[in-house]
Structure formats: C-alpha cells, structure tokens
Amino acid sequence: PTRFETPPPASVDMLWANMALHESADPQALLAEWHQALKVDGFLMFSCLGPDTARELRDIYAQLGWPPAGHELTDMHDWGDMLVQTGFAEPVMDMERITLTYETPARLLHELAELGRNFHPARFPALRGRQWKARLEQALVEHLTGQDGRLSLTFEVIYGHALKAPPKIRISALSAVSVADMRSMLQGQRPHA
C-alpha cells in the first residue's frame, strides 16, 4: 500500500482511510498518528477487513493441513476499543458481509493476490509449485462452487468513525477555573487557553 507522509499535528479536519488499517503491523500506533494529525473535533472514517473475510478459504487450508491462508483480522468491537484507548470519542462501528463470486479459481486467486499478502507467522515459508496450485484450484472448485457454477467467497467489511474530542480538563485536588472560563462553558464556548 502507498504510505503517505504524516501531516503536522492538529492540521487535518477529516481523515478517511479505506482498506488500510488491517494491513498495519501496529494499528494502535497508526490510530495514535491519526489522532495526533486531526484537529479538535476532527472526524475519522475508515473501513477495513474483518475476521470473517475469506473464512471459506481458511476452512479449505485447514482441511488440507496447510498453514493459515491469511493473518488474523481484528473484530469490529476491538477496533472500537482501540479508538477509545487512543483518545477518540463517540466511536461508531458497523460491519457487513459481502459475498463475491468468481468464474474461475484463477480469477479468485488473482483478486486475492491484488488485495494484499499473508502476514500470518505460520504461513508457507517459501514458494509453492504447480502441483500445489492445481490442488488449491481443485479444492476451490469443490468447496466454493454454487448452483450458478460460480465460486463464492465472503468478505467482512468493517466501517468505523469517531471524533477527536477536546482535551479533558485536568482535575486535581485543587483546581482553579476563571470566571471568564465558567461563563464560556455555560455559553457552550471553549475555555480560553
């Protein structure tokens, strides 16, 4: 995936990340970068793949005794928790399962290759040969072919959005708030810095 330069702190009003978060080696750190880049009241929107993605392919790999077909993907509830831990407010999470169909195993495998790579630590350590690919294609036809003759594969897409909340006022045993700040708070304005 293309890596963009990190914008200066508090310089972005809205950040939209489509299908990037699940490929991050450290998603919590990436969320922290996004939080830092957003202005107060900035809006984050993202989509990523969820754990039910390609579940049929994972089942086939397991039946054949092969290592996992892909790395573990994060559940939407865990993404919501990470948003809160990073300092985002009012996270809203949703998901949908989309079934894509393919005419041939070759087309299915080509599209999967375009989507990314397998980060699972137990993945195949080296290239596989033609016999392996033929066996995989045969298993795809046997297990994924529907009544219409097409191969079906499920993708779970997670959607999330959240706001960067104003910094919380630190409260200690002794706190001082000016009269001007109290008036501003009562009128729905931000306190003076």
How would you label these PLM feature ranges?
Residues 9, 34-37, 67:
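Catalytic cores of nucleotide-enabled group-transfer and carboxylate-activating enzymes in metabolic
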Residues 45-107, 114-128:
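Conserved catalytic/acceptor-binding region of the Class I
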Residues 96-193:
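Conserved Class I S-adenosyl-L-methionine
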Residues 28-43:
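A short glycine-rich, Lys/Arg-flanked "PGG" loop and its adjoining helix->strand segment in the class I
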Residues 4-15:
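A short acidic, Gly/Pro-enriched loop at the edge of an enzyme's catalytic core
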Residues 7, 22-24:
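A short His-aromatic
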Residues 10, 86, 153:
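Structured loop/turn residues at beta-strand edges in well-structured enzyme cores
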Residues 17-20:
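A short beta-strand submotif of the Rossmann-like class I SAM-dependent methyltransferase core
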